[in-house]
Amino acid sequence: MDVLLGRDETMDESDYLHVNNTCAPSLGLSIARDAETAINTVIILIGGPMNFVVLTTQLLSNRIYRSSAPTLYMTNLYFANLLTVTMLPFLILSNRGQISSSPEGCKLVAVTYYASCTAGFSTLALISVNRYRVIHQSTNKNAAGSKKKTYGVLALVWLTSLMCASPAPTYVTVLAHDGDTPDSVHETCIIFFNYDQVKTVLATFKILICIVWGVMPVVMMTWFYLFFYKRLKLTSYRRRSHTLAFVSTLILSFLVLQTPFVGIMIFDSYAVIEWDVTCESINSRDAVAMLARVVPNFHCMLNPVLYAFLGRDFNKRFMQCITGKLFSRRRMLQERAGVRSPSTPHRAARQLAKIGTLTRSCSRSELQRSASAPPPQ
């Protein structure tokens, strides 16, 4: 959602904002907007179906297989990513003035987008912490208690994410663009700040996003990777090489995307605080920030590949979902029971043979006893 700076604003009877003095977009800002639209379109077309397929497979699998803490964290990650991708079409069309909404609708989209992004990054941190506990073998043996605790942690994550996203809807409104012709009149959802709020409210908002979406995930992932590599040296070479390659792919792909994002957000926060509020500086900063805000959306396209399709367990369950086995819980449980005891018919035949042998031997002993018994008087 675009951030607009202006002064001398007025509200009409529909609570639509009319700004009399704003900066005209520069050529660089227009190019950045087109690039953002193209990248987000690719993310929607690829990341949306992938997250839907992965989330559906995970939910169906949780009905049959016992769900552990990592499984629930993965399910929450795919749900948060799918929710983020779902908001992108509205944001793209609204930024281009091709769709309009009420101020309440814009506020709902804003809080949903920022909360789902925050929940996604928080879930990645939870997955790292859970793997840290697995390495230390400090997982809870009580499955029921651990599952309840996991649900409580996820509820706390979403509550915290909503609290972190709550400042955004406060400044979200609808901007009415008054054109020369009726066809050129349109509305867009924006985050509006007056010039007097730039170095206070907007700077705080930028710093909060930089910390929650940038610094904290990078620090968490870097710490986990260094600790995991140190602990992995104690294991065998075969297990170490396979596990290290998998974890390196996860962590390094995250850091390659996230580290430039942190640098750009730190620069953006510095520019908001130190630069003068002029049209040239506003357009330059907005062009950089516009490309930086597609980085959180990139994770929605990469997470299903890294955390789902690169794993053997998920690929096995995905094939079960394609063949329709996960849709019938009774059928799947019967097949799993049959796999566990493949020699049941042979065992039953051997048991019947033993019973027949015992019956024949018992009949012979009874005949011998009856033959040796004295006749009745």
Swiss-Prot record:
Q: Which organism is it from?
A: Murid herpesvirus 1 (strain Smith)
| Disulphide connectivity of cysteines | none
Taxonomic lineage: Viruses, Duplodnaviria, Heunggongvirae, Peploviricota, Herviviricetes
GO CC: one term? host cell plasma membrane
Q: Glycosylated where?
A: N20
UniProt subcellular location? Host cell membrane
- What GO molecular-function term can you cite, just one? G protein-coupled receptor activity
Its family remark reads: Belongs to the G-protein coupled receptor 1 family.
Transmembrane segments in this chain: where?
Answer: 34-61, 72-94, 108-129, 152-170, 207-226, 247-270, 288-311
This protein's membrane topology, according to the annotation, is: Multi-pass membrane protein
Please explain the role this protein plays, according to its UniProt record: Plays an important role in vivo, in particular in the dissemination to or replication in the salivary gland.
Cytoplasmic topological domain residue ranges: 62-71, 130-151, 227-246, 312-377
Q: Which UniProt keywords apply?
A: G-protein coupled receptor, Glycoprotein, Host cell membrane, Host membrane, Membrane, Receptor, Transducer, Transmembrane, Transmembrane helix
Q: Which domain of life is it from?
A: Viruses
Q: What is this protein called?
A: G-protein coupled receptor homolog M33
Q: Which SUPFAM superfamilies match?
A: Family A G protein-coupled receptor-like
Q: InterPro entries per the record? A: CCR1-9-like, GPCR_Rhodpsn, GPCR_Rhodpsn_7TM
Q: Which residues lie on this side of the membrane: Extracellular?
A: 1-33, 95-107, 171-206, 271-287
